[in-house]
Amino acid sequence: MKLKNIAKASLALGILTTGMITTTAQPVKASTLEVRSQATQDLSEYYNRPFFEYTNQSGYKEEGKVTFTPNYQLIDVTLTGNEKQNFGEDISNVDIFVVRENSDRSGNTASIGGITKTNGSNYIDKVKDVNLIITKNIDSVTSTSTSSTYTINKEEISLKELDFKLRKHLIDKHNLYKTEPKDSKIRITMKDGGFYTFELNKKLQTHRMGDVIDGRNIEKIEVNL
């Protein structure tokens, strides 16, 4: 066997048996070779998409969708949950949180949920700050925890907006989706003890994107990475 073929065979064997290539000249850290699943790559792509916020909008409802035209931009928002019953044909004084779901090149934007009532009171800067606690598991027995404030700007806020913005914060500041999220979760605890959970190994379920909670009653937000 030619030396060239021997080298190729040896290289292939090394990959099969060790799962990575090593070299004495320039060792490679295992972390740089970790392969993310397609599902995790898809989550990273989705939660890195641009989002758009529009306040005090009016629209009309037809066949399970609400059409808005902010700044002459056509936006169709699909209603998925309880908001189907909450809105009549003509809708006004609402805010919309938009993440584009369609991939075609048309000028129209399709989004899901994210409709809330416009604030009834005027606020200086924010509605409230809540405690954001982020715990990272180092190994099976060791973890680190940090605490900071998270600003809520709406009296009513959709689970879609909370989920999307929190994950974007974790992507930007804590490397979410650089590795597999496994059992990572976000937990939103309310003043009455109720809570909402976002599982970070999957996209927020479509039927929850239209659900709305009172931002003034959020007690704390906990993240386990």
UniProtKB/Swiss-Prot annotation:
InterPro entries: Enterotoxin, SSL_OB, Staph/Strept_toxin_CS, Staph_exotoxin, SuperAg_toxin_C, Superantigen_bac, Toxin_b-grasp_Staph/Strep. It is found in: Secreted. SUPFAM superfamilies: Bacterial enterotoxins, Superantigen toxins, C-terminal domain. Its main location: secreted. The keyword Transcription regulation does not apply. It comes from the Bacteria. The keyword Transferase does not apply. Residues 94-196 are annotated as: Sialyl Lewis X-binding. Keywords: Secreted, Signal, Virulence. One of its GO terms (cellular component) is extracellular region. It holds the Pfam family SSL_OB. Residues 1-30 form the signal peptide. The C-terminal domain contains a V-shape binding site for sialyl Lewis X. Secreted protein that plays a role in the inhibition of host immune system. Targets myeloid cells such as monocytes or granulocytes through binding with sialyllactosamine-containing glycoproteins. Prevents initial rolling of neutrophils toward the site of infection by interacting with host SELPLG. Disrupts neutrophil motility by induction of cell adhesion via interacting with glycans but independently of SELPLG. Belongs to the staphylococcal/streptococcal toxin family. Homodimer (via its C-terminal domain). Interacts with host FCAR and SELPLG (via sialyl Lewis X). This is Staphylococcal superantigen-like 11. It comes from Staphylococcus aureus (strain NCTC 8325 / PS 47). The gene is sl11.
